[in-house]
Amino acid sequence: MNKLVKIFMFLLLSSCSAIKKEVIDCPKLTSFKEAAEVVVKSEKNIPVYIGIRGVQTYCTDDNNDVDMELSINIRAIRNDTSIEDYVPVNISVVSLDASKNEYERDDFSYSQFMLKNSRIVDRSTQFNLSVPKGGEVLLGIR
């Protein structure tokens, strides 16, 4: 009986250690200026500046890949605050392998609500992406 308990405890503890992933350095993340800041037209045809205002990353080892979690803060700024409006935002995150070939892509589109009298609105959006080891990530808005 004692031997059975020891075997059970060993299996339980060894399986728990396999669940925890190893945290590693994240691959290179790049956003070209043309893809990091854009001026778009709102639904009511008013120009609105959209820009990336921060990125947080968390990466873990996943065999041949890196599992990358991103939190991207997008800021919308407008001058005309007299009306409520919606602004279209399109975010693309692309992982590339070492040969610069597309490995995985995640595109996300939404309408950012601009409340009356609100000049600046921030929104954080989460992504999860697989990146091959030795690869990199490109980030852009349009």
Indicate where each model-derived feature is located.
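Short, solvent-exposed beta-strand/turn "edge" segments of beta-rich domains on protein surfaces
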Residues: Q56-E69, R78-D85, S130
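Post-signal-peptide N-terminal segment of Sec-exported extracytoplasmic proteins
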Residues: A35-V66
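Short, surface-exposed ligand- or partner-binding patches at beta-edge/loop junctions that are enriched
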Residues: P88, V131-R142
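Short, solvent-exposed, Trp/other aromatic-anchored flexible loops in extracytoplasmic proteins
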Residues: D107-G135
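Predominantly extracellular/luminal regions of secreted and cell-surface proteins
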Residues: I24-V40
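C-terminal motif of bacterial Sec signal peptides marking the signal peptidase cleavage site
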Residues: S14-S15
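Sec-dependent signal peptide recognition
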Residues: N2-F10
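Extended low-complexity, serine/threonine- and proline-enriched intrinsically disordered segments
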Residues: V87-A98, I141
